[in-house]
Curated annotation (Swiss-Prot):
The keyword Transcription regulation applies. It is found in: Nucleus. Residues 218-290 are annotated as: Disordered. Signal peptide: none annotated. InterPro entries: Fork-head_N (IPR013638), Fork_head_dom (IPR001766), Forkhead_box_C (IPR018533), FOX_domain-containing (IPR050211), TF_fork_head_CS_1 (IPR018122), TF_fork_head_CS_2 (IPR030456), WH-like_DNA-bd_sf (IPR036388), WH_DNA-bd_sf (IPR036390). Transcriptional repressor involved in embryonic nervous system development. Plays a role in the induction and patterning of the anterior-posterior neural axis. Involved in the establishment of floor plate differentiation from neural plate cells during gastrulation. Binds the anf1 promoter sequence to restrict expression of anf1 to the anterior of the neural plate, thereby patterning the forebrain. Can bind to the HNF-3-alpha DNA target sequence. Cooperates with t/bra in a dose-dependent manner to specify dorsal mesoderm formation, including notochord. Primarily expressed in the dorsal blastopore lip (Spemann organizer) of early gastrulae. At later stages, expressed in the dorsal mesoderm and the neural floor plate. In the dorsal mesoderm, expressed in the notochord but not in the presomitic mesoderm. Also expressed in the mid-brain area. This is Forkhead box protein A4-B. Its main location: nucleus. Residues 249-258, 267-277 have a biased composition (Polar residues). It comes from Xenopus laevis. One of its GO terms (molecular function) is DNA binding.
C-alpha cells in the first residue's frame, strides 16, 4: 500500500525516516516466529513471490529486501508442508475407514440374497398341492414332498425342522389331503398322500398364490350337524316348536257340532274353560300358553271359509281384545264379510283389559270365572252395599 502511494505521488522521500521503528510493520520472516507449528500455510507462496517480481524494477532498497525475505519464506513453508503431507501410498480416506469397508464386503453374514434364495410367496398347502399334482401318480410320500420342495426352492434348505413340521400339520388338519396306505405291491416306509377328488377348485385358475376357498369334506359337515342336534337345549326347543302345531291340528279337527254344544252353556268363562280343557293337549303349562296364544292368531291350517264358519258359531266364545282398540288391528283390515260376523265387538268385559298382554294370568282368570260363576258378581254387589251403608249411616240432609 505504501509502495503504491509512493509511486503515484512520485515522492522520493524515504518513509522509514518519518515513522519510528516500532510503528512500522515488521517483515514477513519475523511473523513466522509467532505462528504455531501446526498452523495451515498455503503451498502457493512461491508463486506469489514470483508474481511480485515485476515490482522490483525501479524500487528502492527496502522493497527489494522484503522481496528477498519472501523468497526465503517460500522455501521454509515448502519444508513444513512437505513434512505434514500424507504418504503417497495411502488414499484420501482415513486408514480405519478403509479397513472397515473391506471387512464389510467380506462378511458372509451380511451378504444380500438374490431372488432365487428368497422365500417363495406360497403357503404350505400350495406347496403340497403343487408337489402332488406334478407327481406322475398324483400321490407322494412325506419324504418325497420334502425333497421336491428343497429341490425347487433353495430357501427351504435352511431350518428344515421348522417348515417340515408345518408341512406335517398341513397334511393332517386339512380335508383336501387324503392319506392312502401302501399296497402290498409297493412295500416301503410311510403312506402316500393325495388330493381329495372334489378339491380341484381350491385355487383360482391354477394360481397357487391364494386359495379361492377352504375345502371342507361333506361327511364332516353332516357329523357336526348330528352332534349339534343331540344337544339337550335343542330337545326343549323342538318340543316348544311342535306345541302350537298340535293345537292347530286339534282346533281344525274340532267339529261344528261340538261348537254348538259348547255354545249352549250359560257362563262364557265356563265355555272357554270347556273349549280349552276338552282339547287333547292337556293341562301342562306349555299347552296352556300355546292355547291362549293361538286364540289371538289366525289358524294357518284352515281355509278362509272354514275359519269364518267357526268364528260365526263361536263368536260369543272368543272375543278379540284388540278389535276396538286401534284401527290397524287384523280384524279391522280384514274383509267386510268377516266384519259382519262381529256384531258385538264392543261388548267386552272391561275387567279383562289389564290381562291382555299376560296370557298366563288371563287363562287363570277364566278358570276362576268358570268356578265361581255368578256368585262373584252377587258377592261383590253385596259387599259394595255394606261398605256404603257403613259410611253413610245417617241421611246427608240431617247432617246439615
Amino acid at each position: 500500500m505504501l509502495n503504491r502511494v509512493k509511486l503515484e505521488l512520485k515522492d522520493p522521500m524515504d518513509w522509514n525516516t518519518m515513522y519510528q521503528e516500532n510503528e512500522i510493520y515488521s517483515g514477513i520472516h519475523n511473523m513466522t516466529n509467532g505462528l504455531p507449528s501446526n498452523s495451515f500455510l498455503p503451498t502457493d507462496v512461491p508463486t506469489v513471490t514470483s508474481s511480485m517480481t515485476y515490482m522490483s524494477n525501479g524500487l528502492p532498497g527496502p522493497v527489494a529486501s522484503i522481496q528477498g525475505n519472501l523468497g526465503s519464506l517460500g522455501s521454509m513453508t515448502q519444508g513444513m508442508v512437505g513434512s505434514l503431507a500424507p504418504p503417497p501410498s495411502t488414499s484420501a480416506y482415513p486408514l480405519g475407514y478403509c479397513q472397515g469397508e473391506s471387512e464389510f464386503q467380506r462378511d458372509p453374514r451380511t451378504y444380500r440374497r438374490n431372488y432365487s434364495h428368497a422365500k417363495p410367496p406360497y403357503s404350505y398347502i400350495s406347496l403340497i398341492t403343487m408337489a402332488i399334482q406334478q407327481a406322475p401318480n398324483k400321490m407322494m410320500t412325506l419324504n418325497e414332498i420334502y425333497q421336491w420342495i428343497v429341490d425347487l426352492f433353495p430357501y427351504y434348505r435352511q431350518n428344515q425342522q421348522r417348515w417340515q413340521n408345518s408341512i406335517r400339520h398341513s397334511l393332517s388338519f386339512n380335508d383336501c389331503f387324503i392319506k392312502v396306505p401302501r399296497s402290498p405291491e409297493k412295500p416301503g416306509k410311510g403312506s402316500y398322500w393325495t388330493l381329495h377328488p372334489e378339491s380341484g377348485n381350491m385355487f383360482e385358475n391354477g394360481c397357487y398364490l391364494r386359495r379361492q376357498k377352504r375345502f371342507k369334506c361333506e361327511r364332516s359337515k353332516s357329523g357336526e350337524g348330528e352332534r349339534k342336534g343331540n344337544k339337550p337345549g335343542d330337545e326343549t326347543g323342538g318340543s316348544l316348536k311342535e306345541t302350537p302345531v298340535s293345537f292347530d291340528d286339534c282346533s281344525s279337527s274340532r267339529s261344528p257340532q261340538a261348537a254348538v254344544n259348547d255354545g249352549g252353556r250359560d257362563s262364557t268363562g265356563s265355555s272357554i274353560h270347556q273349549a280349552t280343557g276338552g282339547s287333547p293337549v292337556g293341562f301342562s303349562p306349555t299347552s296352556e300358553q300355546a292355547g291362549t296364544a293361538s286364540q289371538l292368531m289366525y289358524p294357518l291350517g284352515l281355509s278362509n271359509d272354514g275359519y269364518l264358519g267357526l268364528v260365526g258359531e263361536d263368536v260369543h266364545l272368543k272375543h278379540d281384545p284388540f278389535s276396538g282398540r286401534h284401527p290397524f288391528s287384523i280384524t279391522q283390515l280384514m274383509s267386510s264379510e268377516q266384519d259382519q260376523t262381529y256384531p258385538n265387538k264392543m261388548e267386552m268385559c272391561p275387567t279383562t283389559d289389564h290381562l291382555v298382554h299376560y296370557s298366563n294370568y288371563s287363562s287363570d282368570y277364566h278358570n276362576l270365572v268358570s268356578k265361581n260363576g255368578l256368585d262373584m258378581q252377587t258377592s261383590s254387589s253385596s259387599t259394595d252395599n255394606g261398605y256404603y251403608a257403613n259410611m253413610y249411616s245417617r241421611p246427608i240432609l240431617s247432617s246439615l
